[in-house]
Amino acid sequence: MRGCLQTVRWLTSAWQRPRSYSPLSRAAPCRFFNVSIPRNAQSRKPVSELERRIAAISIDRFRNFCIVAHVDHGKSTLSDRLLELTGTIQPGGNKQVLDKLDVERERGITVKAQTCTMLYNYRGEDYLLHLVDTPGHVDFRAEVSRSYASCGGALLLVDASQGVQAQTVANFYLAFAEGLKLVPVINKVDLPSADPDRALEQMANTFELDPKSAVLVSAKTGLNVEQLLPTVVEQIPAPVGDHTKPLRMLLVDSWYSTYKGVILLVRIFDGEVRAGDHVGSLATGLKYHVGEVGIMYPGQTAQSVLRAGQVGYIYFNPAMKRSQEAKVGDTYTKVGSEKLIEPLPGFEEPKSMVFVAAYPVDASDFPHLEDSINQLLLNDRSITLQKESSEALGAGFRLGFLGTLHCSVFEDRLRQEHGASIIITPPTVPFKVIWKDGKEEIITNPALFPEEDALRAKVVELQEPFVLATLTFPEEYLGRVIELCESNRGEQKSLEFFTATQVILKYELPLAQLVDDFFGKLKGSTKGYASLDYEESGWRRSSIAKLQLLVNKVPVDAVSRVVHSSQAQKLGRLWVSKFKEHVDRQMFEVVIQAAVGRNIVARETIKPFRKDVLQKLHAADVTRRRKLLEKQKEGRKKLKAVGNVVIEHKAFQAFLAK
């Protein structure tokens, strides 16, 4: 009994004592994080040996450079050798490390600008080298020019067997305009067909570069490549920048990650950027919290800071989800510093100059095609997209590209990476309509081109885009090339010999002629020795009209095209003869016509199946014979008037095939 009373007394006193809460009690919840840390800041990690070495390098020992070359002159292979020499990647077995896309490896071209950071010890001091591997083709000129803006110098690479080509010339002038220090490099000197002396002579005559300063290498075998890195350190100037000034960051390129959103490739001109910083775009006005910063070494390697002079990557948290927000050439700065800095020069929106329509072969595949196109658009903000519908081919898309190679690469990626079965219409270019009320309209879809009555009553002028084309080729093909350019409505601007046997020819050409397999015809005229580059040359007044394909007087909407008046009849004849091959015979006569407005320029007729109505008739019954034939003729007229021509989907696919 006494024990029970003591227990009750102890419990009562315990209840009356002040409570002391444990750290895990509900009134005082445990917090496993410090609330004073910004929500986007990275957890502090031990500083790596790589980051320690980079932090010890001052900006005067930074070198940002790129490789300027024609397509297939060995840019990506030379990049591999430089990465191996600096220990960034292991030697042996590397092939085009900076070419990430399947289509880049398959075609041997660079489509997306890539970068890699290298550490190089020269005379006992560490140097931080940033190599930017740029596209060589004119279609990707926006990426090329922004890549050049992030560099202080360039290796001007020329194939020893092919010599200076059109894109070498075009990219040289882009690099020269950016003020880059150019180092001449002759590649592929190990080939039996190599002629380095001729290549050096061309570089001296065309670019006024000293042949004695050139480095002769073989990127494939590694011959003399080790001489390039000391040349880069000695000849290419260090970037200019101040890490104490407000942040000025140039967007060089971007790509999309499923987990991180849009990742930006950037060059820091002033200031520095860290994870947790609040930055904004001067072009769009949008603001973001930085989630991570780092360098490409050669993959994404996180760093605590990117400072003035460096080239690296950043992504945001929350993520940037729309690639259209990442505009190449845009300037970023910290929020609050927008009025303290000037935007970096050269920003311009990419303009689509080649348009195609894409339709699924099977109409039920439209959702898959839409999803595939949207996924590819995440990595390419320069493509324009618009849904459209055709009575002949069903639902599809009208896509705008920078050029024909850009279009071809996108089509290859759509088929290879997403397994899309598609019908692509021939490429078209935009046209400008100037109305009588002063309004100007850009037409990118032939279906929206004004009809004949509207052209006469309401339109003042029609214009089409022209380009200045630069062609390089051996002198023996000069006559053929001039003939080709003249037949494509070209106007000669200049002709010069930059060696005894090589010619640079400049022509102004309509862009519509250029996208109509002009390069293929040029290669055929010169046995593959010619190269081509071009730049926009503005709009010109032109006599253009809409050519339509009619089947039994009904327009086929998917096949209409805007052409020059001088070519309407020739193209119309080609259309009707080709379309006739793919249309099945019907029970009635099928008339295929090509028309410009009300004017028929070409015609083909598909004869109907013939039923022998005289089979059971007595040979001598002439009156009955005539009566049956007249009746059959009348029946066919009625059938033709009310019957619809059945055109198989595969007929359009075959007709539109290249």
UniProtKB/Swiss-Prot annotation:
Membrane topology annotation: Peripheral membrane protein
Transit peptide: 1-40
GO MF annotations, alphabetized: GTP binding; GTPase activity; mitochondrial ribosome binding
Pfam families tied to this protein: EFG_C, GTP_EFTU, LepA_C
Domain tr-type G: residue ranges: 60-240
Gene Ontology CC entries for this record: mitochondrial inner membrane; mitochondrial matrix
Binding-site list for GTP: 69-76, 133-137, 187-190
Coiled coil: none
Record-linked InterPro entries: EF-4, EFG_III/V, EFG_V-like, G_TR_CS, LepA_C_sf, LepA_CTD, LepA_IV, P-loop_NTPase
Enzyme Commission no: 3.6.5.-
CDD domains in the cross-refs: EF4_II, EF4_III, LepA, lepA_C
Gene Ontology biological process terms from the UniProt entry: positive regulation of translation; translation
Record bears the keyword Mitochondrion: yes
Enzyme class: hydrolase
Source organism superkingdom: Eukaryota
UniProt cross-references to SUPFAM superfamilies, sorted A to Z: EF-G C-terminal domain-like (SSF54980), P-loop containing nucleoside triphosphate hydrolases (SSF52540), Translation proteins (SSF50447)
Reactions catalysed according to its record: GTP + H2O = GDP + phosphate + H(+)
Alphabetized UniProt keyword annotations: GTP-binding, Hydrolase, Membrane, Mitochondrion, Mitochondrion inner membrane, Nucleotide-binding, Protein biosynthesis, Transit peptide
Family stated for the protein in its record: Belongs to the TRAFAC class translation factor GTPase superfamily. Classic translation factor GTPase family. LepA subfamily.
The protein's role, per its UniProt record: Promotes mitochondrial protein synthesis. May act as a fidelity factor of the translation reaction, by catalyzing a one-codon backward translocation of tRNAs on improperly translocated ribosomes. Binds to mitochondrial ribosomes in a GTP-dependent manner.
HAMAP family: LepA
Name of this chain's protein: Translation factor GUF1, mitochondrial
Organism: Paracoccidioides lutzii (strain ATCC MYA-826 / Pb01) (Paracoccidioides brasiliensis)
Organism placement in taxonomy: Eukaryota, Fungi, Dikarya, Ascomycota, Pezizomycotina
Gene that specifies this protein: GUF1
